[in-house]
């Protein structure tokens, strides 16, 4: 599960039970993102900001360069390429918790059925488009571990703000930068140009308010939904407003 800093606790990060599964999962998830980025903006990273962001994420997750290049060529040449579509589902968990699911799929019927099953088994329900997304703000989010950064906080803040960041926060063990979605790439690339290591860098959904679950059964039910979504390879990201 995710941590308890100001921003990082709003996204249930997909995790697997062991390192081998985690490696396979990372390649699967990012491989699909590469395919979609190439489809939307072409195979040249210099002319495709979304692809640059995905490549940066792939490298941050230790994906080999040849795997990245093979994914780009495969998507660009349509050689055995799968046509993935981006789909979003919104719904409710116990006690009105809001959940957003983003998936990349080659079979929307299969994915919709699996997502609906995950909600139902956790005593939740899938709603209509827009039923909970208004409770979240789409933002770029960059987290920098203090242990991995030698730069002074003020200098780091100026680099981020000059590049277009909206906000800069210092936590106990990290710096957290937020941006508008359209400014995310510029801020990430400005930090990258200064050789600043980023623990994570992505466009995410930040909840405007949080829901606390005090009933043990509610917690177990929501956890069941999140676990089932974790196990679905079509699901890329799950966002919620549970204050863990």
PLM features: residue spans?
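N-terminal cationic and glycine-rich segments that engage phosphates or anionic surfaces
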Residues: 1-127, 132-143, 183, 240-243
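Positively charged, low-complexity, intrinsically disordered RNA-binding extensions
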Residues: 141-244
């Amino acid at each position: 599960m995710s941590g308890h800093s100001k921003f990082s606790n709003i996204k249930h990060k997909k995790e697997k039970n062991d390192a081998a599964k985690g490696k396979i999962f990372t390649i699967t998830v990012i491989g699909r993102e590469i395919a979609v980025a190439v489809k939307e903006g072409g195979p040249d990273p210099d002319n495709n900001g979304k692809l640059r962001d995905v490549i940066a994420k792939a490298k941050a997750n230790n994906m080999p360069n040849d795997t990245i290049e093979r994914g780009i060529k495969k998507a660009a040449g349509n050689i055995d390429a799968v046509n993935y579509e981006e789909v979003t589902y919104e719904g409710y968990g116990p006690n009105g918790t809001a959940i957003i699911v983003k998936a990349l799929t080659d079979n929307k019927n299969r994915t919709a059925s699996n997502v609906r099953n995950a909600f139902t088994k956790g005593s939740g329900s899938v709603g209509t488009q827009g039923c909970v997304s208004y409770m979240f703000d789409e933002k770029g989010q960059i987290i920098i571990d203090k242990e991995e950064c030698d730069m002074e906080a003020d200098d780091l803040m100026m680099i981020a703000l000059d590049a277009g960041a909206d906000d800069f926060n210092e936590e106990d063990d990290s710096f957290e930068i937020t941006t508008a979605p359209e400014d995310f790439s510029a801020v990430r690339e400005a930090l990258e140009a200064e050789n600043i290591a980023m623990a994570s860098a992505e466009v995410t959904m930040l909840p405007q308010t949080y829901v606390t679950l005090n009933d043990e059964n509610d917690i177990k039910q929501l956890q069941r939904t999140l676990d089932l979504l974790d196990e679905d390879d079509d699901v890329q990201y799950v966002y919620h407003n549970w204050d863990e």
